[in-house]
Amino acid sequence: MAHGRKPWALLSSLLAALMVLVGCAGPEYTYVTNSSDRTYLKVPNSWRPIDPKAIDAALGLDTTVKDSERGLWLQGYDADASPSPDHLFGASAAAPATLIGVQDVPMSARGSYSLDKLRDLFYPVSPSSQQQAAADPTSVVQDLSVMSDEVLTPGDGVRGVHTVFRYRVAGGPPQVMDQTLYLNDDASKLYLFFVRCSTECYQQRQKEITNVVSSFTVLEKL
């Protein structure tokens, strides 16, 4: 007469099967790193990389020049099914898109970077720049309003600013950008990061976006 399997044996088999399933599951996050400049970001694995050459072209950079030659490292990721630099810099992004970068600062420019200059790296965020943009009929940025602004001093001489703001570009729908900019101790390196999408997207996916923002880490060289 055949006997049924003992409960502990059945449980052991189920646990073994579960471990196999866990082991086969893909990673939950993609880790974006620039080890030489000790810069790190974590994005959901569903966010796909944006073609670096497409980012360069969107910024008007020479796509044939290597990052090391121009002193600029950039990486973009997009939660949209069709990753595009338009979702970083265009009028609208229905899903979160993020850009992370490190730029060498020329010796002649190292004394010119104030916190307001960091705030204004992508859009006219500082009060004075907002006033200038409002008075300029050719400005493509409209209805910019700062939601939060925080000066950052994480240590090791690194300093910067974290700003979240609403805005519209070229008459497009309202967007939200969450940006963090840092300078290292001697202002020889500029570290940049932002994630943006529509206001509806930002509200619906705020936890996901906040996790990405909080993962952005810059460490001064030892």
Predicted regions and their residues:
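Bacterial signal peptide processing site
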Residues: A25-P27
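C-terminal motif of bacterial Sec signal peptides marking the signal peptidase cleavage site
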Residues: V20-G23
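Post-signal peptide N-terminal segment of mature Sec-exported envelope proteins
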Residues: Y31-K53
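Conserved polar/disulfide-associated segments of primarily extracytoplasmic proteins
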Residues: A54-Q179
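Surface-exposed amphipathic alpha-helical segments
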Residues: W47-P49, A187-L222
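Soluble non-cytosolic domains of exported or imported proteins
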Residues: R38, S112-D116, T199, Q203-K207
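A short, solvent-exposed beta-edge/loop patch
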Residues: Y182-D186
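Bacterial N-terminal signal peptides that target proteins for export
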Residues: M1-L14
